[in-house]
Amino acid sequence: MPRRAFYYKKSENVRVFTSFLYLCAHELNTSIFKQEMKTIYDFTVKDRKGKDVSLKEYANEVLLIVNTATKCGFTPQYDELEKLYEKYHAQGFEILDFPCNQFGQQAPGTDESIHEFCKLNFGTEFPRFKKVKVNGDDADPLFKFLQEQKGFAGWDMNHSIAPLLEDMLSKSDPNYKEKPDIKWNFTKFLINKKGQVVARFEATEKLENIEAQIEELLK
């Protein structure tokens, strides 16, 4: 084989091998990227005073993550949530409360005033975090992740407020049910002890139905 042909073949083999390694590395990086943000433990949020809190602090606990509001028709759910918290907290259950002002501007006021309102009116003891946005480009990354994991769960049409929400949202967007975004205050996400999102409940869901699933995850 002529020397020039030999070197050309060798160079071509090196080029092909290098390309192969590049593709392997790309596939590996893509695979690793897809595995990122698999659980809520990958996220850091801010408490009501602005301090960073890693959700790894809640590893091995069953969590209920809720976007809340203080001037909403569902605000009395704070009372039910507190009872749920008191009943199961010692068994490893935690409620993470994220006030949100995106729905009818029903969570006005500062983080501290919201906290004081909930303590005074409902005696809440579960953790409350800094007010967040849950939809849109500026949505908190945690809530973007939660939506990706569990889409709209549907209204309980037996609830008195459900027909009003259905009418309002369907007029705004006839296809709203097909989208995973948060529809209203007091949407709840249930997290297992591995940090995985296992269920989503809309604001109209009965708390006793949620409680049954919490009990199952605590076993």
Residue positions per predicted region:
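Thiol-based oxidoreductase modules, predominantly thioredoxin-like and allied folds used
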Residues: 92-109, 125-136
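Thiol/selenol-based redox catalytic cores and closely related redox-interacting motifs
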Residues: 117-119, 123-205
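Basic polycationic patches enriched in arginine
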Residues: 3-4, 15
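N-terminal "domain-start" segment that seeds a small globular fold
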Residues: 33-56
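Non-catalytic, surface beta->alpha helical segment in thiol-disulfide oxidoreductase systems
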Residues: 199-218
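Short hydrophobic alpha-helical segments enriched in small aliphatic residues
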Residues: 12-14, 18, 25-27
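Conserved helix-turn-beta segment immediately C-terminal to the redox Cys motif
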Residues: 61-63, 70-71, 75-99, 118-122
